[in-house]
Amino acid sequence: MDTKTLIASEIAKVVPELEQDAIFNLLETPKNSDMGDLAFPAFSLAKVLRKAPQMIASELAEQIDESQFEKVVAVGPYINFFLDKAKISSQVLEQVITAGSDYAQQDEGQGRNVAIDMSSPNIAKPFSIGHLRSTVIGDSLAHIFAKMGYKPVKINHLGDWGKQFGMLIVAYKKWGDEAAVQAHPIDELLKLYVRINAEAETDPTVDEEAREWFRKLEDGDKEATELWQWFRDESLLEFNRLYDQLHVTFDSYNGEAFYNDKMDEVLELLEAKNLLVESKGAQVVNLEKYGIEHPALIKKSDGATLYITRDLAAALYRKRTYDFAKSVYVVGNEQAAHFKQLKAVLKEMGYDWSDDMTHVAFGLVTKGGAKLSTRKGNVILLEPTVAEAINRAASQIEAKNPNLADKEAVAHAVGVGAIKFYDLKTDRMNGYDFDLEAMVSFEGETGPYVQYAHARIQSILRKADFTPSATTTYSLADAESWEIIKLIQDFPRIIKRTSDNFEPSIMAKFAINLAQSFNKYYAHTRILDDNSERDNRLALCYATATVLKEALRLLGVDAPNEM
């Protein structure tokens, strides 16, 4: 139990008028540490108890069990709590040393599934930095949900269907070179895609021809299907090479095409419930009662189905297949209206489990303030970017530690980790401007900075030849140690907040805070001095490294032992 929860529970025992959660939210940290570690303002009880806040604080301070604290005193209208730092540090260190990487493991999920729709790049298009956000946010949330006791199911809902395949088939038949595509599939397909889109802007017949080829594809035309399958296979080979570099795996690659034969059932269900309304020849579902002005367009006047029809089929399939406790869609915030419609249509169909679906939206990645666009050829491709990040990391490692063993593996961990961490430390609803130099820096709020703090601690532990014993009591009460202890103790709550808010930036900021606190401690404390505090300080180092490594793992970032 963290100290804030402990204090809230002790106050709740003597204040039945307030719920423990309400007390927890009222607790404050005094500006001056001489006034205690946490304080409870009695103002909120004045009306209920019909007493002055000062009197309430004085009376309650007398009633609270002080055995858990150094002291409890009333100061004006506040009850100030002074924590027993030695006792708490001993408990926290024991918990981390005993549990190791399982420290802060929770059982909220009880093994239930969480479906995570993530990454989902478009076939025959390059994997760009724009796809990175969905990939790394989804991967981090999968780790977080597992830490909360859920079983994550990572779904790569590939963009392997749609009019763009009509465009690509037209382009390939006009200008395609089979040998060139086989040699450099994504590069060649991207060139074809950009070229055909440029031509379509001045020649309206291109769109008509593309629509015709896509209709053939929908009807199972042999030539169209073979080309589509080839584009898909070549793209997946390239994507999987990148996923291997990012250390990201999936449980399902069922993309849009997988649901082609599952949409008729959706239409039948909607018709059976009389939810479909004709509008200008199209079939729609009205959602005004959900505060959604525009109806959900299910079927166009030419009989073609839309994304939402496919997503309805996917939602039904996932619920039946995984019986998820939560289903999250890690998709850009420009799709917010689509997901509101999706949930509302499912609700109209009578599926209350739609309440368990969440659109985990995120902002755009820009370059020099400009929006990225595959169609216009303005992209930052991930593969060369990862290679450049690894090279930059290797240069810095060579300068800092030229005799390091496994330099290539460490450079990979640092370079890839730098890109992931920079993305994840940003509040997901905010975008960020891509800056590789800032990402790979060992200074500032970066992945390499946190990784280096972990490696520094491992170096200290190796030098001291120290391994903590689960049967030894370690304890610290100095101010510098206390800042670290408080953060380590807060780790379980940070994990839960990250999970509840679908917000990996909470975890990334925690990792930065812990690394900064340790570096400050390292600068002011002679850790290896041979005195009575040496083992206590080393135990703190061990616990800090354990939690730093686990925080990075939950972000999908490796923590090398040497850098």
From Swiss-Prot:
SUPFAM superfamilies assigned to the protein according to its UniProt record, in alphabetical order: Anticodon-binding domain of a subclass of class I aminoacyl-tRNA synthetases (SSF47323), Arginyl-tRNA synthetase (ArgRS), N-terminal 'additional' domain (SSF55190), Nucleotidylyl transferase (SSF52374)
Q: Where in the cell is it found?
A: Cytoplasm
Q: Which reaction does this enzyme catalyse, per its entry?
A: tRNA(Arg) + L-arginine + ATP = L-arginyl-tRNA(Arg) + AMP + diphosphate
GO CC terms, sorted: cytoplasm
The yes or no answer to whether the keyword Nucleotide-binding is present is yes
MF terms per GO, please?
A: arginine-tRNA ligase activity; ATP binding
Please name the GO terms of the biological process aspect recorded for this protein, alphabetically. arginyl-tRNA aminoacylation
Q: Where is the signal peptide?
A: none
One Pfam family of this chain: DALR_1
Enzyme Commission no: 6.1.1.19
Aminoacyl-tRNA synthetase recorded as keyword: yes
Motif 'HIGH' region boundaries: 121-131
Task: Give the transmembrane ranges.
Answer: none
Q: Which domain of life is it from?
A: Bacteria
Keywords, alphabetical: Aminoacyl-tRNA synthetase, ATP-binding, Cytoplasm, Ligase, Nucleotide-binding, Protein biosynthesis
PANTHER family from the xrefs? ARGININE--TRNA LIGASE, CYTOPLASMIC, ARGINYL-TRNA SYNTHETASE
Description of how the protein assembles with itself and partners: Monomer.
Q: Which family does this protein fall into?
A: Belongs to the class-I aminoacyl-tRNA synthetase family.
The protein here is known as Arginine--tRNA ligase
What species is this protein from? Answer: Streptococcus pyogenes serotype M3 (strain ATCC BAA-595 / MGAS315)
Organism phylogeny = Bacteria, Bacillati, Bacillota, Bacilli, Lactobacillales
> Which gene holds the coding sequence for this protein?
argS
